[in-house]
Structure formats: structure tokens, C-alpha cells
A protein has these predicted regions:
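N-terminal periplasmic/intermembrane-space "pro-region" immediately following the signal or transit peptide
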Residues: 26-181, 471, 580
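Surface-exposed coil loops of outer-membrane beta-barrel proteins
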Residues: 143, 177-193, 225-252, 258-341, ...
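Hydrophobic, lipid-facing positions within transmembrane beta-strands of outer-membrane proteins
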Residues: 148, 162, 198-203, 246-253, ...
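Short loop/turn motifs that connect adjacent beta-strands in outer-membrane beta-barrel proteins
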Residues: 149-164, 177, 210-214, 258-263, ...
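Residue-level signature of outer-membrane beta-barrel architecture
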Residues: 157, 170, 205-209, 255-257, ...
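Glycine- and aromatic-enriched membrane insertion/assembly motifs of diderm outer-membrane
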Residues: 161-172, 184-224
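Outer-membrane beta-barrel pore domains and translocons
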Residues: 169-173, 219-221, 268-272, 320-323, ...
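Outer-membrane beta-barrel pore domains
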Residues: 190, 227, 236-241, 347-355, ...
Length: 580
């Protein structure tokens, strides 16, 4: 409308000048039809035409500037997209077009007859500052190369209210130990061998409107059984929280505050960043991560505040129920947080820290602290080369438990040493414009007390039952556990939404831990009493100590059954992963 009115005003003025300017000439000739025009009148017509031509140029210029301003002020279609527009100052416009800055040599232009109010309105609109949209945090570079980030760059369908997300993850494992019960232990990603399995089918996405936000992602498949199994907190108190939460990997809601570069406050179930690797295998450089990732939390239940002081820095404190816990295992919540910094497009620095939590079920005075620190560097980037990118990630973890009969340093007064030290290093290569990927890496841990070792599911053992007793793989204070692993991963990525992956892994522990040929399932299946020893006849011994179990099994003409645990494991896993 403003454009239309401005055009109408200018054209009305131009027409008025064109009609009225010759009137004095007609007045002079009205006395006699044969009177000839004077020399002065003959010169007036070219001057008027020159002024009208200058005014026409001026109008065209203003119309073009209004159109450019309107385009620049149009909202961006995608979050993080910035359309920078800087209006020309009046002096700049005049310098660019000398004819419009001085419509007549004398400076006494008929353009001065334009209404001052109209000129002021036009100038005000033209010189009003245009504030570019603020950059979204971490949006000014391509971070799809990071380990733990999805590589999808385009969304097929998006709205102002909802951004959908769909994930599917299927795998097949060949375990060279060939367990007769097909059961794999010591992993939070692989659980069965010689079978095709659905790891996760996730449907959900992000809801966002008027600064209110929410996210939902489901986890149908193996994750819905295996992830809750590693949480001891449901053993504290009543209500079947595992059934309530098992099919949800993320579910939270919150609000976005437009301060600094953004502040988000969310509450619910959200993913943990400890261990660098994403909970979703599609996002990672490898399928089976090393111990400092696989043995640390995948989710938290609580409240987080994401503070973005700059576009390259995030400070995120957590108030959570505990260490990968739906409930609180004792009487005190956990506190923690993350600092993420990306000073350059080729480097990512992350520090995660956790403390205060009391996460050992039935041991209320034992406290846990942990730090997890990572750096990722893209040190080679030539998109047109056959080998187009190279990057590495290095993660180091340290932590301990103290109180309740254990200590961080193993002194006599505090009890046996209960600590965690570990690292992992991966190097990633991309080929042929990211059509192929190759990752080599591995890691090592030392975890006396075994409080972060993934408990083998012997006879259906879970984190809850192990808090009472785990007869076949103990987790007593000071129990040793040292392990290392290595892997090589090859990816074929024909589209940004799918990955075909082949991976070889070798893992070693200093104690029998991995499933061997004989399996980890009792002869007649799980007895329903994982805290008790099992007899070879397939029945439970009713005893939690080995001498009592031997006596009980002998009484029925049997012996004590033991799982087949090995110090070494190697396997090949093949997977198809999809993300929209």
C-alpha cells in the first residue's frame, strides 16, 4: 500500500507540473492569435522536460529501493538462515546518482515543490535501520562431519509448528565366539548374534511455536528392553516406571527466551552427551563405540538450561534424577552440565561433568563424580578430491566413587579404590564427496569396583537385581576390570538419509567377561532368580554364595552351572540405518 501511495503522489505531482507549467504561455497569447512566443518562453519547455525527466528517474529509483527493502525484510524460511540487508544512506544514494542529487544546475529544482511531509515520510522509511536476524547458535558452519551429529542437511517437509523426524536402525552380528544362546554381553548397542534385529524405530520430531518447544522420539525395538535394563533406580520405591518410559528415548518440553543468543529451559527425558557418541547410531562414525561411551549415560531425566552467550558457546547445567536414571536411586538428585565451544569451523571442544549424585542402589552414602572431555578436529577438507575429508575425535574420562566403604584413591581409611579412567580415539576418512566413509579407532578403560561396567545379562540379570547380588560376575568394591578394544568401520552412503555399514570389532578384558561358546543362559532357560546360583539340572539352587549352592545342587544329584565367559571377543556387525 505504501508503495502504491508513493507512486500515486509522485505521478500526481508530475502531471500537475506538466499541465500547469505551460499556462503562463497561453495567458500571454490569449490577447492575439497571431502573436509569436518570446525567446524566454521558447527556453522554458526544454527546462521543464529536463526537470520532469529527472523526477521520473527519482521515482524509479525510490520504487526500486522500496522493493529491495521489502525483500530484505521478508522472514527466513529456515531457522538459522540470515538474509543480510543494509539500506543505502541518503548521501550514498545521491552519490550513486548525481542527476537525482541535483535536478537543475542552479539547485533551484521544481522537485522542491514536493510536500515536505511526503519527502520526510519517504526518507524516514528509506533510512530506517534494518536489523538482520540473529544467528542461531552453531548455524554458521557445516557441522555434519562431527562424530555424534547427523549428516542430513535437508528436510523434505517442515512447518512453522512441527519438524518431523523418523529413524530406523537394523543390524546383523556374526560373533566369532559363536554363543549357543546367541546372547551378547558388554554392549549397549549389540545384543544378539546370528539374527537380524531392529535396534530402534523412532518416530517423532520437534514442536516449536511462539517460543514454546517440545520434542518426542520413540524407541521401538531392542532399545526399549536393553536401555531400561541398565538403570538400577526402578528398584527404589514403587510404580513400574520402566513400563512407563521404555518406549521413549526423548520426551521433553520447554521455553525459548530471546536473550543473549538464546536460552532454552527444558524438562523431561533428554539425551546425555557424556561419551561423545550419539545414542542414535546413524549419527556416529562407528556402530560399537568404545567403553568410555558405551558404559556412560545415554539419557537423563530432569531439567536442563541451555545458555548461548555467543553463537559458538553453550553452557548447559543439569538438574537430574541421577546417572542414566528414570528414578533417583537414593535420596539426592544429581547435578552436572556441559560446556561446548566451537572457536573455528574445524574444531569442537566439549566438557561434560557430573557430581553430587548417589547412584548406587541401597548404598545411600556413596557419591559419584565424573568428567568427560572431548575434542574433535577436521584437519583435512578438499571437497573435490577423492579423499575429501579427514577428522579425528579424542575423548578422555575420569571419575570415582567415595563413601559407603570405597574411596577414590584406595586408602585404608576410606576403603578399596573405586575409580574410572579411560580414553578413546577415532579417525574418520570420507571419500568421493562423502559417498564412502572409513573409521578406525578404539579405546581403553580401568574401572576397579566395576561400577560402570555393563553387567552381562547372565540368567536375566539386570542392574536392579545386581544391586542385591550378581553371583557370576561380581561388582564388589575393588574388583578389577581392565579392557581395551579396536574397530574398523566402512560406510556406504548413497543418500544423506541412509547408511549401509560394515564393521569389525575386537575387544579384550583382563577377566572373563564376554560370552563364549557355551552361552550365558542356564540349561533350562532363565530361572527367574538371577541373584542365585543355578544347578546344571536347570533349577535354582536357592543360594547366593557358592559353597551353599554346591551343597544345594549336590543334594539333588547335580552340580553348579556356570556361564561360559571369555577374555576376548571379535565380531562383524552389518547394519542399515535410516534418518529423515
Amino acid at each position: 500500500m505504501s508503495k502504491f501511495l508513493m507512486q500515486s503522489n509522485w505521478r500526481a505531482i508530475a502531471c500537475s507540473v506538466f499541465i500547469l507549467a505551460p499556462l503562463p504561455c497561453f495567458a500571454q497569447t490569449s490577447g492575439t492569435a497571431n502573436q509569436q512566443p518570446s525567446a524566454a518562453n521558447q527556453q522554458a519547455s526544454p527546462e521543464i522536460l529536463k526537470e520532469l525527466e529527472a523526477m521520473r528517474h527519482r521515482i524509479d529509483e525510490l520504487e526500486a529501493e522500496l522493493k529491495a527493502q521489502k525483500t530484505a525484510q521478508a522472514p527466513a524460511d529456515r531457522p538459522g538462515f540470515v538474509s543480510a540487508a543494509f539500506p543505502l544512506k541518503t548521501a550514498d544514494r545521491n552519490a550513486a546518482n548525481p542527476e537525482s542529487s541535483s535536478l537543475s544546475p542552479s539547485g533551484d529544482s521544481r522537485a522542491a515543490d514536493i510536500s515536505p511531509a511526503q519527502e520526510a515520510a519517504v526518507v524516514t522509511k528509506q533510512t530506517a535501520p534494518i536489523i538482520p536476524e540473529q544467528k542461531q547458535p552453531f548455524s554458521d558452519a557445516d557441522w555434519t562431519w562431527l562424530n555424534g551429529n547427523p549428516r542430513t542437511k535437508e528436510i523434505f517437509w517442515d512447518t512453522k509448528f512441527f519438524t518431523p523426524e523418523i529413524r530406523a536402525d537394523m543390524n546383523y552380528v556374526v560373533d566369532f565366539n559363536h554363543p549357543i544362546d546367541h546372547s551378547i554381553g558388554g554392549s549397549s548397542e549389540l545384543f544378539r548374534s546370528s539374527e537380524v534385529h531392529l535396534e530402534q524405530f523412532g518416530v517423532g520430531g520437534d514442536f516449536h511455536y511462539d517460543n514454546v518447544r517440545a520434542r518426542l522420539m520413540t524407541q521401538f525395538g531392542m532399545y526399549s528392553a536393553t536401555t531400561p535394563r541398565n538403570d538400577p533406580s526402578p528398584g527404589h520405591g514403587q510404580w513400574d516406571v520402566v513400563s512407563a518410559y521404555r518406549y521413549v528415548s526423548e520426551a521433553y518440553g520447554g521455553y525459548h527466551f530471546d536473550v543473549l543468543h538464546g536460552v532454552n529451559v527444558d524438562a523431561g527425558i533428554f539425551l546425555s552427551y557424556i561419551g561423545l557418541f550419539s545414542y542414535y547410531n546413524f549419527d556416529n562414525w562407528a556402530y560399537q563405540p568404545s567403553y568410555v561411551s558405551s558404559n556412560t549415560p545415554w539419557f537423563f531425566n530432569g531439567v536442563r538450561v541451555q545458555i548461548f552467550p555467543t553463537a559458538h558457546l553453550k553452557i548447559e547445567p543439569w538438574f537430574i534424577n541421577g546417572w542414566q536414571a528414570y528414578f533417583s536411586a537414593n535420596h539426592r538428585p544429581g547435578l552436572g552440565g556441559q560446556i561446548k565451544w566451537t572457536p573455528r569451523p574445524w574444531i569442537n571442544i566439549i566438557s561434560n561433568n557430573y557430581g553430587l549424585g548417589r547412584d548406587d542402589l541401597f548404598i545411600p552414602n556413596r557419591r559419584r563424580i565424573h568428567t568427560d572431555d572431548s575434542i574433535e578436529v577436521k584437519y583435512f577438507d578438499r571437497p573435490d578430491s577423492t579423499l575429501d575429508k579427514m577428522a579425528f575425535s579424542l575423548t578422555a574420562d575420569a571419575g570415582c566413587e567415595y563413601g559407603g566403604g570405597v574411596s577414590c584413591y584406595g586408602n585404608k581409611a576410606g576403603g578399596p579404590k573405586q575409580s574410572f579412567l579411560g580414553f578413546m580415539l577415532y579417525n574418520r576418512f570420507w571419500f568421493h564427496r562423502d559417498l564412502f566413509g572409513l573409521t578406525v579407532g578404539g579405546g581403553k578403560i580401568n574401572n576397579p569396583g566395576r561400577y560402570l561396567v555393563l553387567l552381562p545379562p547372565i540368567n536375566g540379570e539386570t542392574a536392579v537385581t545386581a544391586s542385591t547380588n550378581s553371583p557370576y560376575f561380581t561388582e564388589n568394591p575393588g574388583d578389577p576390570f581392565k579392557a581395551w578394544d579396536s574397530s574398523i568401520t566402512f560406510d556406504y552412503m548413497p543418500k544423506q538419509y541412509i547408511t549401509f555399514r560394515w564393521e569389525y570389532d575386537y575387544r579384550h578384558a583382563n577377566v572373563p567377561y564376554w560370552t563364549g561358546r557355551g552361552g550365558i543362559t542356564p540349561p533350562s532357560g532363565n530361572t527367574g532368580f538371577p541373584t542365585q546360583f543355578v544347578c546344571q539340572s536347570g533349577v535354582t539352587s536357592g543360594a547366593t554364595s557358592l559353597p551353599d549352592a554346591q551343597t544345594a545342587c549336590s543334594a539333588i544329584g547335580s552340580t553348579v552351572w556356570f556361564p561360559d565367559l571369555r577374555r576376548n571377543e571379535s565380531f562383524i556387525d552389518m547394519s542399515i540405518m535410516v534418518k529423515f
